[in-house]
């Protein structure tokens, strides 16, 4: 058998000051009637002159008026010593120290100063003998001041009038529950005069439950948390000591003579024939406690309308064993005792007669025996020992090991702040101050039992059963975890899909973003238009430079063409910069990263390596969808631009001039400065109603691309998505080598220009760049081969040769 663990402990003393009752508040003296009332006295005497009126007494100090002066002083003493109301005699400094009968509120201090002033006034006409009388008076005054002065007490805990039931329980009883489950006995008892709140602290009310109900609730919660590791057996008893007789509150029909206190060889105090009950839930405990409180003896007195006339003792016995089957069985047992003592009484205050007087005498006798035991325990230090009168009362016999034995004890002392309980409060504080000196030696109540060889087969069977239970429990836990994980993943998937759908609906339904996409498409369309115009201008420059006969006279035209070509180049570059700028379209994706992503990361089972990759892939495909829509719309705009006669003539002016030689080439070049206004009038039709300008084919392409967003999650788990960038390339403007013209090529002039204009815009290629360099281009749309050379100059040269002939 293992040696029990032993620890040193001491009684924890907590003071609780009850608030004033409604009746006491009506009689409470107003201490703060002015600044002078709150100013503390410094202890020095007042100045006084002979033959003058005293401001306090208005009595002329004269030998002839001695009788009048003495009567006036007597009335003054009676007025101050015996106030009409009550006063507060307890001040809580902090959570540990209190001041009993503070000096600034003690009326005796004020009376002594007045008496001293009168005595010193009479001593002014006396001789040397009167000086000795003055010294005697000072000594008397100091004795009075010292006798009626304030007293400071320091305890383990202090609760003022505003402390709640929950706070009192948490700081006094709650720490004992872990000790009880660890195998140490614990006791909580409330001590104090009648009407000070002991029963309220222990039992409470339905709206403000006391420590019994709060302790039982927390105890069963702790037992529930440990039920997988240990088996618990709980028993409960509830008794009262009334007129030195024990009554079973849960079985009141049991005669008191049969309930006898016994002490076994293991120093355990038990009551023979007391009923023990075995509650399974905290509700069962509450029902038993309520039943016992109904059977408890209470009677109205002058001091308390519902005065407890007995000491109530509630004991909860807890035995626990380990569920793990071993060769040695560990048993741990402990007892939690909660005791509500009856209040000490004064016959004059309670005005009890007959039976109530007899009850009060027995209560005081048992409390006196308790006080004697506390005094004796305080005298039992290491150097001396004395007899402790536990057998003077049945109460002290029950509290024998709670006070000086194997038990952790908390003493909740309830006091009244009213001056009407002056003596009871002072005596209670003195007893509590002595009780905190008591030392106890607590021992863990644990017992180890070795199993017999014959029980090994039973132990093996029990272990197999436990193994099967653990396996089933593990399977259930795994199944629950997997189910929970799947549900969380489904929630994450739904949240991501909702976020993606919201982005798609924003792009498709908000007019601001539709206009922004239309502007992007118009930028590409205008860029393509300016490139074709610039191509015609550059071809005209080459044509005039290679024609030696007309080079000199056409020099002003060449100069204007070069100026216009440079301006067109700058405008194309400006459009490319405008297209690459951050606009409202990118703000939607940015909002997802800055706001929605943070909310998604707060969801349970969010995985950065899986869920974030899936979200980024969806957002990238939405961005790709918007770029594809812009490209498709730009191609549609370009096709409509080809059918516009005015704009079409701007990039075919060279071929028309070569065929007709009219109008003058200088006027054609001058008219090129109006291409911005002409293109703006063309673009207004798309800005005014962007949706009606695109065909159903475009919408079908967009919907088909949107359907591609449903990418299987497995394919995205290890896929890296790099940032998309736009690579701008200009079409090859180098002229073709001069070849002898062929007559059959003449009809191809307009066909070649139309083919150039109708090409899908491939000058902007969407190429993927990563840290290692450019990779294979993404192909949201069908790739179109780039033209290496422009063939329109061949037709131009053949026409010139034919004209010379």
Curated annotation (Swiss-Prot):
Its main location: cytoplasm. It is found in: Cytoplasm, Cytoskeleton. ATP binds at residues 192-199. Transmembrane segments: none annotated. CDD domains: KISc_KIP3_like (cd01370). GO terms for cellular component: cytoplasm; cytoplasmic microtubule; kinesin complex; microtubule plus-end; mitotic spindle astral microtubule; mitotic spindle midzone; nuclear microtubule; nucleus. Residues 764-773, 792-805 have a biased composition (Polar residues). Gene3D superfamilies: Kinesin motor domain. PROSITE patterns: KINESIN_MOTOR_1, KINESIN_MOTOR_2. Residues 774-783 have a biased composition (Low complexity). GO terms for molecular function: ATP binding; ATP hydrolysis activity; microtubule binding; plus-end-directed microtubule motor activity; tubulin-dependent ATPase activity. Residues 449-481 form a coiled coil. The keyword rRNA-binding does not apply. The keyword ATP-binding applies. One of its GO terms (biological process) is plus-end specific microtubule depolymerization. Residues 720-805 are annotated as: Disordered. InterPro entries: Kinesin-like_fam (IPR027640), Kinesin_motor_CS (IPR019821), Kinesin_motor_dom (IPR001752), Kinesin_motor_dom_sf (IPR036961), P-loop_NTPase (IPR027417). SMART domains: KISc (SM00129). Keywords: ATP-binding, Coiled coil, Cytoplasm, Cytoskeleton, Microtubule, Motor protein, Nucleotide-binding. Present with 736 molecules/cell in log phase SD medium. Belongs to the TRAFAC class myosin-kinesin ATPase superfamily. Kinesin family. Kinesin II subfamily. This is Kinesin-like protein KIP3. It comes from Saccharomyces cerevisiae (strain ATCC 204508 / S288c) (Baker's yeast). The lineage of its organism: Eukaryota, Fungi, Dikarya, Ascomycota, Saccharomycotina.
């Amino acid at each position: 058998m293992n040696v029990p663990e032993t620890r040193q402990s001491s009684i924890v003393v907590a003071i609780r000051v009850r608030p004033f009752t409604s009746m006491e508040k009506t009689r409470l003296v107003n201490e703060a009637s002015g600044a002078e009332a709150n100013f503390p006295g410094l202890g020095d005497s007042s100045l006084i002159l002979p033959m003058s009126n005293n401001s306090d007494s208005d009595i002329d100090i004269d030998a002839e008026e001695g009788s009048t002066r003495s009567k006036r002083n007597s009335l003054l003493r009676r007025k101050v010593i015996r106030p009409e109301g009550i006063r507060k005699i307890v001040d809580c400094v902090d959570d540990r120290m209190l001041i009993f009968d503070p000096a600034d509120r003690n009326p005796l201090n004020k009376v002594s100063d007045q008496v001293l002033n009168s005595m010193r006034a009479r001593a002014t006409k006396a001789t040397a003998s009167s000086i000795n009388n003055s010294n005697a008076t000072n000594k008397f005054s100091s004795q009075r001041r010292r006798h009626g002065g304030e007293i400071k007490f320091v305890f383990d805990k202090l609760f003022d009038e505003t402390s709640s039931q929950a706070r009192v329980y948490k700081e006094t009883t709650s720490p004992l529950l872990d000790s009880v489950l660890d195998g140490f006995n614990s006791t909580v008892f409330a001590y104090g005069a009648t009407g000070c709140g002991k029963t309220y602290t222990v039992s409470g009310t339905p709206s403000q439950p006391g420590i019994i109900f709060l302790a039982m609730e927390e105890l069963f919660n702790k037992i529930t948390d440990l039920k997988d590791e240990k088996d618990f057996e709980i028993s409960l008893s509830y008794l009262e000591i009334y007129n030195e007789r024990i009554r079973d509150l849960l079985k009141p029909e049991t005669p008191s003579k049969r309930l006898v206190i016994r002490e076994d060889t293991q120093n355990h105090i038990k009551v023979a024939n007391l009923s023990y009950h075995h509650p399974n839930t905290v509700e069962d405990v509450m029902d038993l406690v309520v039943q016992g409180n109904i059977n408890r003896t209470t009677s109205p007195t002058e001091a308390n309308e519902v005065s407890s006339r007995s000491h109530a003792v509630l004991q909860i016995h807890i035995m626990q064993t380990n569920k793990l089957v071993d060769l040695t069985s560990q048993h741990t047992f402990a007892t939690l005792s909660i005791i509500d003592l009856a209040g000490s009484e004064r016959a004059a205050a309670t005005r009890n007669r007959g039976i109530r007087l007899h009850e009060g005498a027995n209560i005081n006798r048992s409390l006196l025996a308790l006080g004697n035991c506390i005094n004796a325990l305080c005298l039992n230090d290491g150097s001396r020992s004395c007899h402790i009168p536990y057998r003077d009362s049945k109460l002290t016999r029950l509290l024998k090991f709670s006070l000086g034995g194997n038990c952790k004890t908390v003493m909740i002392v309830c006091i009244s702040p009213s001056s009407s309980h002056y003596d009871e409060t002072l005596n209670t504080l003195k007893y509590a101050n002595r009780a905190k000196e008591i030392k106890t030696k607590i021992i863990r109540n644990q017992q180890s039992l070795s199993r017999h060889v014959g029980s090994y087969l039973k132990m093996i069977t029990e272990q197999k059963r436990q193994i099967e239970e653990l396996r089933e429990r593990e399977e259930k836990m795994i199944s629950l975890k997997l189910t929970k994980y799947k549900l969380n993943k489904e929630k994450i998937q739904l949240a991501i899909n909702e976020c993606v759908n919201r982005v798609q609906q924003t792009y498709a339904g908000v007019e601001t973003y539709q206009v922004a996409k239309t502007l992007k498409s118009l930028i590409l369309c205008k860029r393509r238009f300016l490139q074709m115009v610039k191509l015609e201008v550059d071809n005209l420059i080459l044509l005039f430079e290679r024609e030696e006969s007309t080079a000199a006279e056409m020099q002003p035209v060449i100069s204007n063409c070069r100026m216009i070509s440079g301006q067109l180049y700058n405008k194309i570059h400006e459009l490319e910069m405008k297209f690459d700028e951050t606009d409202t379209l990118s703000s939607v994706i940015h909002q997802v990263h800055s706001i929605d992503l943070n909310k998604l990361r707060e969801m349970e089972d969010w995985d950065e390596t899986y869920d974030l990759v899936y979200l980024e892939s969806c957002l990238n495909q939405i961005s790709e969808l918007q770029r594809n829509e812009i490209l498709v719309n730009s191609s549609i705009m370009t096709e409509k631009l080809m059918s516009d006669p005015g704009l079409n003539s701007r990039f075919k002016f060279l071929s028309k001039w070569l065929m007709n030689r009219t109008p003058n080439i200088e006027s054609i070049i001058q008219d090129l400065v109006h291409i911005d206004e002409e293109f703006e009038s063309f673009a207004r039709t798309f800005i005014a109603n962007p949706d009606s300008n695109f065909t159903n084919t475009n919408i079908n392409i967009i919907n088909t691309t949107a359907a591609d967003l449903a990418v299987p999650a497995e394919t995205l788990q290890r896929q890296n998505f790099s940032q998309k960038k736009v690579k701008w390339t200009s079409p090859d403007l180098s002229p073709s080598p001069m070849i002898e013209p062929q007559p059959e090529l003449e009809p191809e002039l307009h066909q070649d220009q139309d083919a150039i204009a109708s090409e899908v815009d491939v000058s902007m290629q969407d190429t993927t760049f990563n840290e290692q360099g450019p990779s294979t281009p993404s192909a949201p749309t069908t790739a179109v081969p780039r033209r290496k050379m422009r063939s329109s100059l061949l037709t131009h040269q053949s026409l010139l040769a034919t004209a010379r002939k």
